[in-house]
Structures are given as structure tokens and as C-alpha cells.
């Protein structure tokens, strides 16, 4: 059964709606800046994606807002846009990727530390602090009666959410699923990442701090927000006369099968991409564009480039990492990059891999778009790899 996308929504450092984000992608605009308070808190790098906080007063009842985490707010705004584009008020089900809710947990700890009494804690804290904070809130707001599921799989969470949603629709278990990913941006959420020493320290010019595939890359820049997609069976979408934006043609998943939790695997990366292509019944030479996972870390980008070079065997699909503009949107990245890819397919362009000045030995073999290209984009491969060896790849078709 064919699964199609009929609505997309986005709230990110590139903009707070599809139109704004489209312009940012076309112009190669960076959404990265500096949060100086992170240095006071103890971070070694103050770089972050700058994401506007939504104003939900007047959109959602006060009591309902009390249980919404930061990332649930982002997800509501992205979902609202996606459902409006699809011409729907409510989906059958909801599946979102989210792997932390740090701010609510820290705030709860501070209340207990100060008052030594849980009665001082707000009633909404429990709903903000659970990993399922996004889906529990949105399922209530949108009156969902079908699947209600949170996918927790590190930086592949958003991509897996789309893949699982598409699988359920293919199996005839749901007609319409709202899916996506969300990521909190507050400083509490990313301190443990900073402790690993994986962040870029290029603070002189934040817009140049994220350098995927560049020989001189220093590390990633954390970011966040939310992305949402409305997935439907082709039969359901055509019956109601919906505009079809793209098809989720293939979904691949793999695990690295061992090793250090933070170490990428060429074998796992290659396997997940091949499984996505097999699921879509296509070969690598049919891919027009790859939205790479590349985050700007020395080892991660190298391993992905090696896997891509093995997969394509000389075929030159265009490749770029939109993380060069957004930073690493972590739990939402797989979903946001699916949205970015659909925007490119609809607009007939490929967004640039900005800040790539000196390719390394592996990336030099690839056909990387360093400036915006006005070309048809019919089939996209989008990669997402996460800590713990969880990998997801999506094939999207125009």
C-alpha cells in the first residue's frame, strides 16, 4: 500500500513556518548563534540553534498549557501547520520522536531541594517531564483515538517515527498518522553532550561553526524545535481530494551490532541505506539527492562518507547536510530533514552544504552541493544515525 505525505509543518532555527524555512534553505541561511548563559552554567561551548519560543496563549487553554513541555509547544505549532496544510483537524494516530525532557526534571529537583515538599510542585510537571510529553499532550489536543506512541531512539528518533507510521499505514492499521520529532533547546538538555567534547568551539562567527564534511570541522552545534508530517494511505488521500506532496517510498533500520555507544559504524550505515532502497524497490543510481546525517564531528562524517561512497560506487547523487545551517536538531532531526527534503522536492532545488571549504579525503569523492542548485529532485535518501547504534533511513519520492 502506498503511503503519502499530505501536510508538513516546521518550527526551527531556520524559521517558524514552511515559507520562512523555504527561504532559509534556498539562501543558505544559518540559524546558529550564541547563548552566553551556557558559559555561566558551565558549558565549554555556547553555540546553539536560536529557536523562537511559541506564544500559545489564545491558541490553547491555560490548563492544557500547564502540562506542555518546551518541545511539546514546538511540536504543537509544527503539527498545527501540517494538519492545516493537509486539510484535517485530527489524525487517526500520532507518533513522535523525543528522547529527553530535561528542563522539567531539573525544575522538579530544584523545587524539592528548596522546599523539601512535593506539594510545591505544579500539577503539570509530571506531564512535562515524561519522555512521552509530546504525544500525550498532542493526542489530547487533537483528540486522537488511534495509535499514541513516542519513539525514543536518540538522533534517529524522528526518522524512525516516520518509518513506523508509514509501516502501520501500509499494513492497513491506520489511515492517517501525524508523525514527526521534537527537541528541547534549553541549556539543561545538552550539558551532557557538551561534557563529551563533541561541540564546535568556532564562536568567532557562529554562522560558520557547523561544517559537515569539511576537513577542519570541530564538532556539532546543538539545536532543536519540531517538525511534523501528515502521512496517509494513498487511497484515503485521493478519496478526499488531498494534495499529495511526496511518497514515503522506503524505510530502512539497522543497529551497529556492538562497539562503543557513541562510535558510528560504516557497516551499520551502509546496511540501513541499502534496506531503505530495497524497501522502495530502487537502486542507488536512481537517487537524486541525499540529505546526509553529517553533524560536523570528525569521526561521524568520515564514517558516513565512507558508507555513501560504497553505496553509490561512483554514481554521483547530489549530497548536502542541512545541519550546516541548522546545527544538529537531535531527536527531531530525522523528521525535520524529511520536511526540508520535501520542501526541496516541491521547490525544485537542493539546499547547500554551507561552510564546506576543504573537503577531506572521503568527502572529496562525493558530489556535495556547496551552493543552492536549481535542479529537479524526484527521489531523496535521508539518513539519521543515533547514539547506541540506532540507524534509520527514509526514501522519499516526489
Regions found by a protein language model. Give the residues of each.
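Glycine-/small-residue-rich "gating" segment that lines the acyl/pantetheine channel
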Residues: 116-122, 163, 167, 184-239, ...
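Conserved beta-ketoacyl condensing-enzyme motif
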Residues: 5, 20, 26-153, 182-190, ...
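Acyl-CoA/ACP chain-elongation machinery
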Residues: 173-218, 251-264, 292-301, 316-366
